[in-house]
Amino acid sequence: MIPLSWYLLLSATLFSIGLIGFVIRRDLIVMLMCLEIMFNAVNIAFASFSYYNSNLTGQIFVLFSIAVAACEAVIGLAIVLALVRNTGINHSDEIVNLRG
């Protein structure tokens, strides 16, 4: 059986990659993808904790969290694509120009 520390190391690595990508990159779609990587890292940590505690409640929470993250990704992508299509703004630095 794989120890819990390996799963937590994987989760921390994925979260770090997502956080660094979110902070460094300015493209809105890439920022959304990095945010999803961070959500998946948290889900891996939740699932591994619930598996090692033999508690199905945590795994059910992970399934609901995946569903919420999927809805968030669809709504976020729709907003970003509408913003790009209507204004041509694709970088987070240019959003300041939208203020009226």
UniProtKB/Swiss-Prot annotation:
Its main location: membrane. Its EC number is 7.1.1.-. It is a multi-pass membrane protein. GO terms for biological process: ATP synthesis coupled electron transport. NDH-1 shuttles electrons from NADH, via FMN and iron-sulfur (Fe-S) centers, to quinones in the respiratory chain. The immediate electron acceptor for the enzyme in this species is believed to be ubiquinone. Couples the redox reaction to proton translocation (for every two electrons transferred, four hydrogen ions are translocated across the cytoplasmic membrane), and thus conserves the redox energy in a proton gradient. NDH-1 is composed of 14 different subunits. Subunits NuoA, H, J, K, L, M, N constitute the membrane sector of the complex. Belongs to the complex I subunit 4L family. This is NADH-quinone oxidoreductase subunit K. It comes from Thermodesulfovibrio yellowstonii (strain ATCC 51303 / DSM 11347 / YP87). The lineage of its organism: Bacteria, Pseudomonadati, Nitrospirota, Thermodesulfovibrionia, Thermodesulfovibrionales.
